[in-house]
Amino acid sequence: INIGFIGAGAVGCSIGKYLCENSSIAKIKGYYSRTSKSVDIAATFTNSKAYASPEELVNECDVICITTPDDIILKVWEQIKNYNLQQKIICHFSGSLSSDIFSGIEETKAEKISIHPMYAFSDKFTSYRQLNTARLTMEGSSKAVKVMQELFGDELHHKIFMLKASDKVKYHAAAAFASNYVVGIFDVALGLLKDCGFTDEDAVSLLGPLTMGNVKSVIENGTLEALTGPVIRNDTGTV
């Protein structure tokens, strides 16, 4: 399967590098982006081609992965849907958008799919190393799902969950609550300790074990059993 990426950020680089190192089915053809520097970096990182135009990439690939910010996915689609897409798979990796964003794809004779790894792509050059641990969600046309299940499920052994297109926003909200919102709450807690005179380092060392212990307990025992402190003791005055 010849795969190309439109968008050369952390997600595109990580998935491309991961497939390069772990798949015998996928061949990474290369990258296109509006920023030539990021294209060159991604192509070098994955030993692939830096494309000068999206049309050239589309012509040479079976699967076109749009790994841009969410707000740009539709703009990319509006551009590439005018190319010859017959029998190609158009894919994006947004957590909140469904494959329905590829409006009119039936007329192009292409297939559509959205794939979302439940994974934090924190670094363009190292995140791929633990990507094998990620669970994936998919939704799209049956033909596209079959091809990508064979790649990520059958060959790479990822646990895959199927979603309804109508559930993507709710699904993404769940991911946000469990990831970025946790970071935000932790930052509030750090701020409160710093107001008490703690240094950044001491505040992290104090709260870190508590946070890690709670997360571990939630995963192992469920949310109700993980509750501790004044809430579980019914200390209403403290609460």
What are these regions (language model features)?
Residues 214-239:
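Interdomain hinge/lid region at the active-site interface
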Residues 46-126:
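Rossmann-like NAD(P)(H) cofactor-binding subdomain of soluble oxidoreductases
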Residues 39, 73-74, 98-102, 145-146, ...:
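Short, well-ordered alpha-helical microsegments
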Residues 28-33, 90-93, 136-139:
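Short, hydrophobic beta-strand segments that form beta-sheet elements in well-ordered domains
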Residues 1, 88, 134:
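Nucleotide donor/acceptor-binding cores
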Residues 38-45, 107-109, 126-219:
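Internal alpha-helical scaffold of NAD(P)-dependent oxidoreductase catalytic cores
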Residues 1-56:
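NAD(P)+-binding Rossmann beta1-loop-alpha1 motif at the extreme N-terminus of oxidoreductases
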